Amino acid sequence: MSSCPRILLVSVPLLSLWLCVLPSAFWGQVSHSEQVQIKPPLLRVIDPPAPDATAAALEARAEQLRAVKLYLDALDYYRAALAKQPNSAGLLNKIGITELMMQRYREAKKSFDQCLKADRKFADAYNNRGVVYYEERKYGVAVKDYRRAIALDSTSASFYSNLGAALFAKKEFEPAVVAYQRAVELDPDVFERTSRGGVQAQLPSPGDRARYDYTVAKLYAKMGYSDRSLEYLRKALEEGYKDFNNVYKDIEFAGVRRDRRFAELVALRPVVLPE
C-alpha cells in the first residue's frame, strides 16, 4: 500500500470562506482593498496523463500537482493511476483527500467509502471520512469515525485532535479535553502544524473558539509548555473569553502565573466601565 497523508484538525473550518452577496450600493462605500474578489473556477492547466506512464509515476505526479493546489489535474493523475491499480485503498484515500480540499464533500465521502470497502483497517480513511462528517456538522457520526480510526491506530495525534473538535462541537467539553490532552501528549505541535496534504487541524466554530483557546492554554500549562500556554491565553483574551478570570484560580496555570509575561498579558485586558 502506498503511503497515505493524513488530514489533521482546521485552524479555521474548511467552510470559512463563504462569500456573502451584498447590495451593489454597499460596494460603492468601501475601498477596493476591502472588496471580496471571487476566485476563478478551477481549471486544468497541464497535459493529461500519458497512457504509457506507470501507476507509480502517475501517483507521484499527482502528489506534486496536489501540493501546488492544481486539484483537477491531480485528480486526473490519481484516477489514471487507479485505472492501472484498481481498488487501491491508498489511491482512493488520496482521491478523497483531494476532493475534500476542493470542498466536494459528497464525492470525498464516496471515495473514502470505496477506500474502506477495499481495506476495512485503513485508519486514515476513517479519520478523513470523519472530517467530511464534521464539515457537514454531523458531529455524532464524525465522533464514531474518529474513534474507529483511533482503535486502529492510537499513535496519531491528529485523530485525537479531530475527536476533540467533534466532541467540543457537541458541547461535550470534558471528553473533548481528554482527547485534546492525549493529542498534545503525542505531539505538542498538533494544533500548530498542517498536514502534508495542506489541510489544517479542525477547530471548533467561531462561537466556541474563545473557550477552545482557553482549554488549549490550560493543557499546555499543565504539561509545562508556558510559551504555548501564554500564546493561547492571549488568543482567548483577545476573543473575549467570558470566564477568563478562572486563570487566577485554575491550578494548571500556577506556573504560568509566576511568569512575568503573564502579568504583562493580563495588563492588556480592556477595562470594562460600569453602565
PLM region descriptions:
Residues V30-D52, R193-R196, Q200-A210, K242-E275:
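Terminal, low-structured helical/coil segments at or just beyond the last alpha-helical repeat
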Residues P51-K84, G90, I97, M101:
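Alpha-helical segment of the N-proximal tetratricopeptide repeat
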Residues A55, A89-G90, A123-D124, A157-S158, ...:
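Helix-start (N-cap) detector for alpha-helical repeat units in TPR-like alpha-solenoids
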Residues R66, N93, L100, K117, ...:
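Position-specific recognition of the canonical hydrophobic site in helix A of tetratricopeptide repeat
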Residues V68-A80, M101-Q114, E136-R148, K170-R182, ...:
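Structural signature of tandem alpha-helical TPR/SEL1-like repeats
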